[in-house]
UniProtKB/Swiss-Prot annotation:
Protein name listed in UniProt: Pantothenate kinase
HAMAP family: Pantothen_kinase_1
InterPro entries on file: P-loop_NTPase, PanK, PRK/URK
GO molecular function (one): pantothenate kinase activity
Length: 306
C-alpha cells in the first residue's frame, strides 16, 4: 500500500504558485540568525515553500475562529477562541528547529497584533539524574525518557488559556537547566517542536494529537538524515573545543577517527532506531509533510486529503 495514500503530493513548483508574493518579509541576516547548525535555507525557500504555508495556516486559524463563534451561537454564550497550536515533528538533524523558528517569525509578521510562542519538547525530558535513577539513561530521546504526562498537561493548560512554566533544556550541558523556565501565558499561536510531537502515550484519556490544530512533519531519506547528523556532530565538537562546560567538550580530546566512530555508533544504536520505531511511524498523522532532498532542499510537499 502507498504510505502516502491519504496525501496529495505537490511539487515545489506547483506549491509555490498557490500563493504569489513579491518578496519575503524578512532579511538574509534574520534568516541566518534562526538557522540551525548545519541546516541550509534561503530566502527563495521562504518565498517558494513557507509563504504558501503561512497562507494555509491563515485558513486554519480562520476556521478555528469560525468554529468558536458557531459554538458560541449554539451554546448561547461567548466562547473564546483557543490558541492555534501547531506541532512540528521529524528526526534529529532534519531541520525541525529551523522550520519552527522560521514559522514563528513569519507568523509574527503575518499577525503583528498576536502573540506567537515557541516551545521545544526537549524541556519535557526527564533530568539526567532522573534518567539514571530510572535506569534508562541509555534510552534518552526514546518515548519513555519524556514526561509525557507533563507535556499533555502543558498543552491542556495552554488550550484553556492558562499560564504554564516549561522547563528549559540545554544542548550544551545535555540536561534540564535547574531553576530556569520558559513562561507561556495565553499565546494566540503556539508552536510545539520535537521528535515526539506526534507520539501518543498509552493509557491516556487525552492524546497529544488532540491539541494540535495543524501539524507538520519534516521528512528526508534516512541516509541523508544520517549524513546531516554526522555533520552536525562535527560542528558541535568544534563549538565545544574551548568550552569545558559543554557536554561535547569531552569528545574533543579523542582522536578524530574514534569520535567519528562514536557518532556513527550513536546514530545506529539510538537515533536510527528511534526514527524507525517511534518517529517515522507518526509521519502520517501530520497535516503536511515537507520532504527534503540533498542540501535540505524541500522538493515535495504532501498535504493530507482528509
Amino acid at each position: 500500500m502507498n504510505e502516502f495514500i491519504n496525501f496529495d503530493e505537490i511539487s515545489r513548483e506547483t506549491w509555490q504558485n498557490l500563493y504569489n508574493t513579491s518578496i519575503a518579509p524578512l532579511t538574509y541576516d534574520e534568516l541566518e540568525s534562526i538557522r540551525s547548525l548545519n541546516d541550509e535555507i534561503s530566502l527563495q525557500d521562504v518565498e517558494d515553500v513557507y509563504l504558501p504555508l503561512i497562507h494555509l495556516l491563515r485558513l486554519y486559524k480562520k476556521n478555528l475562529e469560525d468554529m468558536s463563534y458557531s459554538k458560541g451561537l449554539f451554546l448561547q454564550k461567548i466562547v473564546k477562541t483557543p490558541p492555534l497550536i501547531i506541532g512540528i515533528s521529524g528526526s534529529v538533524a532534519v531541520g525541525k528547529s529551523t522550520t519552527a523558528r522560521l514559522l514563528q517569525l513569519l507568523l509574527s509578521r503575518a499577525f503583528p497584533k498576536l502573540t506567537v510562542d515557541l516551545v521545544t519538547t526537549d524541556g519535557f525530558l526527564y533530568t539526567t539524574d532522573d534518567l539514571k535513577n530510572m535506569g534508562i539513561l541509555d534510552r534518552k530521546g526514546f518515548p519513555e525518557s519524556y514526561d509525557m504526562e507533563k507535556l499533555t498537561s502543558f498543552l491542556y493548560h495552554v488550550k484553556n488559556g492558562e499560564r504554564f512554566e516549561v522547563p528549559i533544556y540545554s544542548h550544551e550541558t545535555y540536561d534540564i537547566l535547574p531553576n530556569q523556565s520558559q513562561i507561556i501565558d495565553s499565546p494566540d499561536i503556539l508552536i510545539v517542536e520535537g521528535i515526539n510531537v506526534l507520539q501518543n502515550p498509552q493509557n491516556q484519556l487525552l492524546y497529544i494529537s488532540d491539541f494540535y490544530d495543524f501539524s507538520i512533519y519534516v521528512d528526508a531519506d534516512e541516509k541523508l538524515i544520517e549524513k546531516w547528523y554526522l555533520e552536525r556532530f562535527d560542528s558541535l565538537l568544534k563549538l565545544a573545543k574551548y568550552d569545558q562546560t559543554n557536554f561535547y567538550h569531552q569528545f574533543t580530546k579523542m582522536p578524530e577517527d574514534k569520535v567519528l566512530n562514536l557518532a556513527r555508533e550513536t546514530w545506529a544504536r539510538v537515533n536510527r532506531v528511534n526514527l524507525r520505531e517511534y518517529i517515522e511511524p507518526t509521519r502520517n498523522r501530520a497535516e503536511i509533510i515537507l520532504h527534503k532532498s540533498e542540501n535540505h532542499h524541500i522538493d515535495k510537499i504532501y498535504l493530507k486529503k482528509f
